[in-house]
Amino acid sequence: MIHDYHITHFLISVPAVYCLPNEKIGMEVAFVGYSNSGKSSAINALTYQKKLTKVSKTPGCTQLINLFEVSPGIRLIDFPGYGYAKKTKKRKNYWHDVICEYLKKRKNLKGLILMMDIRHPIKDLDQKTIESALSVDVPVFTLLSKSDKISRNILQVTSKKIIHDMKMMFETHIQVEPFSVVKKYGIHSLKRVLNNWLR
C-alpha cells in the first residue's frame, strides 16, 4: 500500500508505553536510536515537513514519546534517544529499556526503524535493541544517518562492512541503507519499507 507521508500530522506526546493509544486500532512503526542519531530529522525528511518534529542540537533533550498520524490508524512513533553520555548509566539506559518493553508488549508494531550514525555504528544499545526486536519477530530497517559527513568511497566501504558485521553478529540479514537528509540518501528506500510494513 502506498501512503502519502506529506499529510502526516502530530497526534500526541506521551510519557510512557502504557499511555499509547489502543493497540487494537491501526498499525505503527517506531523510530529508535541513540540521542542525536537523526530520528526526528528522518521523520521530517520522510514527510517533507521541516518542523513536524522538533530537532534539537542538544542530545537527551526529548523526554516524551511523540506520535504522528500518517492516515487514520497509521502511526509513526518517535522515541527519545537512548545512551546520552552525560546522564547516569541508569538514565542512559532508561529509554532503551522502555523500547524493549514496547517491543514485547505492542502487538500492532509492524517494524522498527533504527537510526545509526554511520561514523559510530553498532554500539552496545543498538545491538541490544536489534536483538530484542528479532526475539519477538519485529523486522528492523537500519538507516546509517549522517552519511553526507563522509566521502562516497568511505561510505561504500563502511556500509559494506556494517552489513557484513551485522550479518555475522545477528546470524540473519538486517536491511541497512545509507541515509542523509542533506543529500537525500535513503528517503525513497525508507518509504518503500514503510509501505511494505504498513499494508
UniProtKB/Swiss-Prot annotation:
GO terms for molecular function: GTP binding; metal ion binding. Mg(2+) binds at S40, T62. Pfam families: MMR_HSR1. The keyword Protease does not apply. GO terms for cellular component: cytosol. GO terms for biological process: division septum assembly. Residues 25-199 form the EngB-type G domain. Its cofactor is Mg(2+). Keywords: Cell cycle, Cell division, GTP-binding, Magnesium, Metal-binding, Nucleotide-binding, Septation. Belongs to the TRAFAC class TrmE-Era-EngA-EngB-Septin-like GTPase superfamily. EngB GTPase family. This is Probable GTP-binding protein EngB. It comes from Blochmanniella pennsylvanica (strain BPEN). The gene is engB.
